[in-house]
Design a protein with these regions (language model features):
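Conserved short histidine dyad/triad with adjacent acidic residue
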Residues: 27-47, 81-82
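Short acidic-glycine-tyrosine-enriched beta hairpin
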Residues: 65-83
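Short strand-coil-strand connectors
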Residues: 28, 63-67, 92
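A short hydrophobic beta-strand segment most commonly corresponding to one strand
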Residues: 78-80, 88, 93-104
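Short, conserved beta-strand element in jelly-roll/cupin
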Residues: 37, 46-62
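A short, N-terminal "cap"/entry segment at the start of jelly-roll beta-barrel domains
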Residues: 1-35
Length: 104
């Protein structure tokens, strides 16, 4: 196994909430997540974590406390951590797939 290569095919899906599943690889205080949201997913609370990533498939909508921003396929995401950038995500398409780099 190459420590600098992430084989998402060998990782198990984690499904913490209905409509949300992800595969995660952690290394050195960071994590790389392959995330899949469906239109069933409802984020239960405001997230204040930072996220950097890209939408691979579908269209993601992020609610920044009343300001809605759409992220179609191929769009990058750069959300700094903290209450000012508090957000909730949802899928505008049946499925959204994205990759996120985050603090572990």
């Amino acid at each position: 196994m190459d420590p600098f290569k992430v084989d998402f095919g060998s990782l198990q899906w984690q499904e913490p909430l209905p409509g949300l599943r992800f595969k995660v690889h952690r290394l050195g205080g960071k994590q790389l997540r392959l995330v899949e949201l469906t239109s069933v997913f409802v984020e239960p609370q405001w997230c204040e974590k930072g996220h950097i990533g890209v939408v691979l498939d579908g269209t993601l909508e992020i609610d920044f406390r009343g300001r809605l921003v759409s992220y179609p396929e191929g769009t990058g995401i750069f959300i700094p951590p903290g209450p000012v950038s508090g957000h909730k995500a949802r899928s505008l398409t049946p499925v959204v797939r994205l990759v996120l780099v985050e603090d572990a």
